[in-house]
Amino acid sequence: MCIRDSYKDNAIINSGYGKPHLISVKIDPSAAGDISDTHINWDIFKRVPKRSSPIIVGDQLYMTTDEGILTCLDAKTGKSSWSDRMPGHYSASPIFADGKLYFFSEMGHCYVIAPGGDYNLVSKNKLDSGFMASPAISGKAIYARSKTHLYRIENL
């Protein structure tokens, strides 16, 4: 299991691989025993990524399946706000930088999405090679390692 993010007093857990599911669990250090009836806020089995991790921006959770189905959920309730398809396959986890979400595909595409309750594609970029590794942020730059290159992406 991968604990990727927390939302207020909850941990968001992605089981990954096999039959992945995403669970929101109330963080309670005093809890003991079986807490499934008292501390599980929501549990989702559809459109959950096997490899990449979800990301929370504001009150929204964003994730993409390995096959490119991008979904936005309300982080508190787990209810879907919207879903859309991005071509390609995805292993790299999304990142949030400069007020936008970045999704890098195994085919070398970078989709830039504006966060919010509606799907809003800001731009689509094609790079020379595909991405398996998750990008990193340093200062105002995004570093993304493809199969053949290391990219530095920054607004100048």
Predicted regions and their residues:
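Noncatalytic, solvent-exposed loop/strand surfaces
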Residues: 4-156
